[in-house]
Swiss-Prot record:
Gene Ontology MF terms in the entry: 4 iron, 4 sulfur cluster binding; metal ion binding; RNA methyltransferase activity
UniProt key word Transferase: yes
Residues annotated to bind S-adenosyl-L-methionine: Q235, F262, E282, D328
Xref: SUPFAM superfamilies: S-adenosyl-L-methionine-dependent methyltransferases
EC number: 2.1.1.-
Protein family membership: Belongs to the class I-like SAM-binding methyltransferase superfamily. RNA M5U methyltransferase family.
Active site: C354
GO annotation terms (biological process): methylation; RNA processing
Protein name: Uncharacterized RNA methyltransferase ZMO1179
Lineage of source species: Bacteria, Pseudomonadati, Pseudomonadota, Alphaproteobacteria, Sphingomonadales
Amino acid sequence: MKKIIRLASKGDGVTEDGQFVPNSVPDDYISDDGKLEFGAHHIEPVCRHFSVCGGCRLQYADEEVYKNFLTDRIAEAFHQQALSAPVLKTAHLSPPYSRRRVALRAFKAGKKLTLGYNKTSSHQLVDIVECPLLDKNLFKAAMDLRSFLQKWLAPRSLAQIEMTLADQGIDCLLVMPFPETLEATEAITAFAAEKGFARLSIDQGYGVETRWESERVTVTLGAVPVTLPAHAFLQATKDGEQTLVHMVKEAVGDAHFVADLFSGLGTFALSFEKDKRVYAAEGMRDAVLALKQAAALAGKAVFVEHRDLFRRPLQKDELVRFECIILDPPRAGAKEQIANLAILPNGRIVYVSCNPATFARDAKTLLEAGWVLHWVKPVGQFPWSLHVEMVGLFTKM
């Protein structure tokens, strides 16, 4: 018998002698004939689709194991950069049924419509009838789409579905071919109104066309309603967003003049009280316009610039003006911007990341330039998945 001692980065259990054992957790045992004996941390998956659906990976791990797994993912990323693991705070997990945005797919073969997620490591679809990840209103809206797609999705056609729980209700974008007929147009309006959708848009490959919007669709950030553009980035759960905002505000402290780089719609920029002055830079035009409008209407001291920080990162003479700099880049990290931050003589950096590998890479650049990493807070917004968000505080005296 061999004991499972840890989880590897892809979620497989690992024994002391390095054997990888799928679907196992620490304190499980694997016998010589391959039979797995469950330990105290191995629990029953909560979804009937688990093991087939690719939406979740670790439903059989209890909360203690899952928190340790997310924390270890960050520590391992630092080890890969030949760095000591940072001070890691206890991971925060968003609860089940809390996801407020989702991407699904639907395919019609003959008269059969399949709607759901991809199977694990496959392009095949799993037809879902439940999902413990999603807010119940979001899941209901996804199921409501079945009848609409059954009629209007052409045979052998694929629909990409993006859904967000906005302030006014469900914002739905369907990427699919759609008939340009009066009947089809009226069907969209009737369906969206009947099901109470806030907005329903179609993209046939030529850009997003809003076909139904009963009122301006917004998402509230920092108590400020912000117009929600199509494809805009939004934290996966409100709970996760609140945790990230809390940690960022704690790290920013009493800094008065703050930069928010890769600001998006203003998750952090709009969270501060009016006594702080915030410069926000973002490369997505629609997000910039939405943030500008929201900040102005709320009377927030937020200056917003449309700026591609990969091609035109802030330079040293621009950065030295700020008492604290927040970064929240996409998965690729902020290599170009970090190079300019590293050479600053002093300051405070709050780095929010969704990728341990690029976070550790960028942290190495800062650490080698004399910055100190005080702590990292892991945040699990995607229950039972391999993904982890994190906030880290760097200072240089």
